[in-house]
Amino acid sequence: MQNYTVRPAKSVRGEISVPGDKSISHRSIMFGSIASGVTTVTGFLRGEDALATLEAFRAMGVQIDDDGETVTIQGRGLHGLSEPTDVLDCGNSGTSMRLLTGLLAGQNFFSVLSGDKYLRARPMKRVVGPLAQMGARISGRAGGEKAPLAIQGSKLKGIEYDSPVSSAQVKSAIMLAGLYAGGETVVREPHLSRDHSERMLRAFGAHVETFPGGVKVRGGAELTGRDIVVPGDISSAAFFLVAGLIVPGSDLLIRGVGVNPTRTGIIDVLKGMGGDLELINQRDESGEPVADIRVRHSKLTAMEISGDVVPRAIDEFPAICVAASLAQGTTVVRDAAELRVKETDRISAMADNLKRAGVSIVETPDGMEITGVSSLKGCAADSFGDHRIAMSMMVAGLVAQNETSVSDVECIATSFPGFVNLLEGVVQR
């Protein structure tokens, strides 16, 4: 396990670009593989999670070439995948496993999905359950709750499903199964989750219709390959947004960030806390809104974070916790129980680490209460093998009174392989 030591910063200044969006990178490989014709992907995230998806489709007979600039996919069509000869290894990627479960349920072959010890501990019944209602034959540990998952492809029928959770992974898995199902498949969710699948599937030619509170997919449509430009990942930009806000004297420009409205909860929250964030040069690329974001040091105040904004910021909460730890007053987070079933229990992990840094935090079943302090203490932080915990605590270390060490930082490579170098490149000491 590799530890990393962070020293306090005087400011964070400069211009950067963050790697391509992880959610869009996953989907570009999946949808391009089951489309007819060639799909090219520019800006693909070469992190471990998205590469796990890429390798899974290679294992199912898809020719995918990567010259370092562009990923080129020779699509096999909706029914052109081949039975894999070995277990498909999803690594640490919940997106790979859950979306592949939906896509593979309607194939005419057998497949097995597994992953690392963290992924094998995450809940899969939320996907397996509705897929079983569609006629899928899926078995796994703990009655289908845990991976490895064995999938015997079968004939599927469309269903109407009211999801108890707002999860783009659950929604997307059912939508992908719906491509292979007879009739229409309808998914409703309590709050709108990210809509990259809806946007991209429609661009590929799928019969996808959105309505308030849900999405409808009609099976049988052939997808056609296309060119995709992947914007910068706002979940990766989040660490630099928070760093720019909390480190005095900071002025940072992040270029080419995806600002899909289902993903901009982080911007709404940080602005709500008093953060000086400005979206400039707003534009549209491959059906996704994109902007440059300027962030400057700001005095932050506490707020309540709950309701619709939570699924729009679900992956950014570790970084938000760092901002809240330096905000005046007590920030209350509610409706975020989903954080407990991420790569680790992110509520407990951030509470544990920020307490070590001198912050007063009370955990609740679906969130936490964070009382801000004027400064953080350097500490020995535990990443818990979670990339977002590791990066969040490295950002916290920039404003600690002395050095902060973060354990097991190799996990950062799942989503942001160049994070350390990019951060050190803008930190002024």
Swiss-Prot record:
Belongs to the EPSP synthase family. This is 3-phosphoshikimate 1-carboxyvinyltransferase. One of its GO terms (biological process) is aromatic amino acid family biosynthetic process. It comes from the Bacteria. It is found in: Cytoplasm. GO terms for cellular component: cytoplasm. It catalyses: 3-phosphoshikimate + phosphoenolpyruvate = 5-O-(1-carboxyvinyl)-3-phosphoshikimate + phosphate. Its main location: cytoplasm. It comes from Citrifermentans bemidjiense (strain ATCC BAA-1014 / DSM 16622 / JCM 12645 / Bem) (Geobacter bemidjiensis). The active site is at D315 (proton acceptor). Keywords: Amino-acid biosynthesis, Aromatic amino acid biosynthesis, Cytoplasm, Transferase. Phosphoenolpyruvate binds at K22, G94, R122, Q169, R346, R388. Catalyzes the transfer of the enolpyruvyl moiety of phosphoenolpyruvate (PEP) to the 5-hydroxyl of shikimate-3-phosphate (S3P) to produce enolpyruvyl shikimate-3-phosphate and inorganic phosphate. It holds the Pfam family EPSP_synthase.
